[in-house]
Amino acid sequence: MSAKIIDGKRLSQEVRAECRARAARLAEKGTQPGLAVVIVGDNPASRVYVRNKAKACGETGIYSEVHEFPENANQDEVIGRIQELNGNPGIHGILVQLPLPRHFDSSRVTESVAVEKDVDGFHLYNVGALVTGSSIFPPCTPNGVMKMLEKYDIPIEGQHAVIVGRSNIVGKPMALMLLQKGATVTICTSRTRNLAEHTSRADILIVAAGKPRLITAMMVKPGATVIDVGINRLSDGKLAGDVDFESVKEKAGYITPVPGGVGPMTIAMLLCNTVVAAEQAHARLQGN
């Protein structure tokens, strides 16, 4: 048996087409969605992500601008810029590119983004809304995973979902979103004892541990859906996920590749959140 490949690249194009149509309708009414990205330092991966986001915005009809700061930037200076963007009516979404330099308090910086412009979903208000099932801006990567499961008609209710990784960006919000859809959820880490005992019981296995090829075929239930959120650069320069794709694809029912799986969906959901923020801003202007 060979798993069906969940094509994140193709699916992201469908999602982006929907966003493009909504952005065009807004533009006809006089509001072009706008996204500002704040980046601090010279992290090569972060710069690639920012370029990809800017390119995707241009292709979707979203205005974008990048605010760059050096590695030794003052935190208050960065927060001051974010506060300026909070008051800019032409900017509807603000994204702080993580990670920030070590001398920054990441929570304080992300908390400085206005709630209504928090398209990454990292503000405490939006985190709380996610807990209660009323989030307007769900975090982009978990939301992209949920969209994948939906589009491929993969059942969630009543299924056992195992998440490897407990980050605030992926693991924890992913668990909440699956719980809201009726899954039984187990959260593990790369240090969980007898990890394979947990992963091998999963109907849906989502891996976001940052450990290349952590999950092997022997750790996967036959026919399971395997979502690989990890992306790691190996010593030979090649990219690898947290799942040993070649072996696991022979055992899983569905699997995402790396690259071309979750990554494109993350950007697509960021675009959607930005359009939603612009739609809400336009409605406020109209007094609705």
From Swiss-Prot:
It comes from Nitrosospira multiformis (strain ATCC 25196 / NCIMB 11849 / C 71). Signal peptide: none annotated. One of its GO terms (cellular component) is cytosol. Keywords: Amino-acid biosynthesis, Histidine biosynthesis, Hydrolase, Methionine biosynthesis, Multifunctional enzyme, NADP, One-carbon metabolism, Oxidoreductase, Purine biosynthesis. Its EC number is 1.5.1.5, 3.5.4.9. It catalyses: (6R)-5,10-methylene-5,6,7,8-tetrahydrofolate + NADP(+) = (6R)-5,10-methenyltetrahydrofolate + NADPH; (6R)-5,10-methenyltetrahydrofolate + H2O = (6R)-10-formyltetrahydrofolate + H(+). Belongs to the tetrahydrofolate dehydrogenase/cyclohydrolase family. Homodimer. One of its GO terms (biological process) is methionine biosynthetic process. NADP(+) binds at G165, R166, S167, S190, I231. CDD domains: NAD_bind_m-THF_DH_Cyclohyd (cd01080). GO terms for molecular function: methenyltetrahydrofolate cyclohydrolase activity; methylenetetrahydrofolate dehydrogenase (NADP+) activity. Catalyzes the oxidation of 5,10-methylenetetrahydrofolate to 5,10-methenyltetrahydrofolate and then the hydrolysis of 5,10-methenyltetrahydrofolate to 10-formyltetrahydrofolate. This is Bifunctional protein FolD. It comes from the Bacteria. Pathway: One-carbon metabolism; tetrahydrofolate interconversion. NCBIfam families: PRK10792.1 (NF008058), PRK14186.1 (NF010783), PRK14189.1 (NF010786).
